[in-house]
Amino acid sequence: MLRVLFAGTPEVAVPSLRMLAKDTEHFEVVAVLTRPDAPTGRGRKIMPSPVKMAARELGLDVIECDPADECFLSALKATGAQCAAVVAYGKILRESVLEALPLGWYNLHFSLLPQWRGAAPVQRAIWAGDEVTGCSVFRITAGMDRGPVLGQSTVTIGAHENAGELLDRLAEDGAGLLAASLQALDEGVVNAVDQPAGSYDVAAKITTQDAHMRFDVPAFALDRQIRACTPAPGAWANLHPHGDDANETLHVSKAIPADMTADESPRNLKPGELHVTKHHVWVGTSTDPLELLVVKAAGKREMGAPEWARGAHLAEGAYLD
């Protein structure tokens, strides 16, 4: 039986923790390392991480000491862990920590390494228009996501799937891959493969400014941007409801390139120009219009775009930029 320390923080890490804790034939989760309690939600109430809440539910010990503190190494060694499983923990581990466990630290990364190393692999894959992505389990070394790979699994990206939906699928798929990789490690049959040298796309974190939509691009590019930025940080644009300089923020969480065969589909919209009918809201792009499906105005709840438009009192010439 492999004695495992689990390190993770957000909801996406919980399926892996549960799978390892459930498989008592092969694993003993000796402790859980997670980020400190932090302000959460609109009320900014101090809350434990999803991983910490799951660990409590499972009756597992939680290490409160920060890995950067000197006390951490002694706390780590006291667990008797042989290796560590890491899923979206959110902190860089110093070399002395990586060397403290006899079998090392292993990370579940949500891309097919070496492609999309970095903080936002799922979002970047969608934004780039990738049709296939997946999960990789690799040994953590000094370089960012560059250690030898123990195993990979692939999934097809749905044509209308957003980053949150895809990440949920990868979290479930990756939990099985992580468990299988650690079991192979324990049995001595793992085949770790060095990542090939070369230049690969880096998955930089998507900022709020990155999520600002520009409409002088094709409709398919905006569709990818919206799906990549949903649920966070959320794609947005400046709405000019009266066609003048006055503006407010409009978030868009779902849209599709317009069906140009439909009778109501508009023609010849300028980039950013809005066209509204009873059941549809379109915005012009550099190619075909983009139909807005789900939006959220400032201070309002998320709603269907036609419902929003009925209450927005849009004037002739209203536009987004």
Swiss-Prot record:
Belongs to the Fmt family. Attaches a formyl group to the free amino group of methionyl-tRNA(fMet). The formyl group appears to play a dual role in the initiator identity of N-formylmethionyl-tRNA by promoting its recognition by IF2 and preventing the misappropriation of this tRNA by the elongation apparatus. One of its GO terms (molecular function) is methionyl-tRNA formyltransferase activity. It catalyses: L-methionyl-tRNA(fMet) + (6R)-10-formyltetrahydrofolate = N-formyl-L-methionyl-tRNA(fMet) + (6S)-5,6,7,8-tetrahydrofolate + H(+). This is Methionyl-tRNA formyltransferase. It comes from the Bacteria. HAMAP family: Formyl_trans. PANTHER family: METHIONYL-TRNA FORMYLTRANSFERASE (PTHR11138), METHIONYL-TRNA FORMYLTRANSFERASE, MITOCHONDRIAL (PTHR11138:SF5). NCBIfam families: fmt. Keywords: Protein biosynthesis, Transferase. (6S)-5,6,7,8-tetrahydrofolate binds at S111, L112, L113, P114. The gene is fmt. The keyword Protein biosynthesis applies. InterPro entries: Fmt, Formyl_trans_C, Formyl_transf_N, Formyl_transf_N_sf, Formyl_transferase-like_C_sf, Met-tRNA-FMT_C, Met-tRNA-FMT_N. The keyword Transferase applies. Its EC number is 2.1.2.9. It comes from Bifidobacterium animalis subsp. lactis (strain AD011). GO terms for cellular component: cytosol. It is an enzyme of class 2 (transferase).
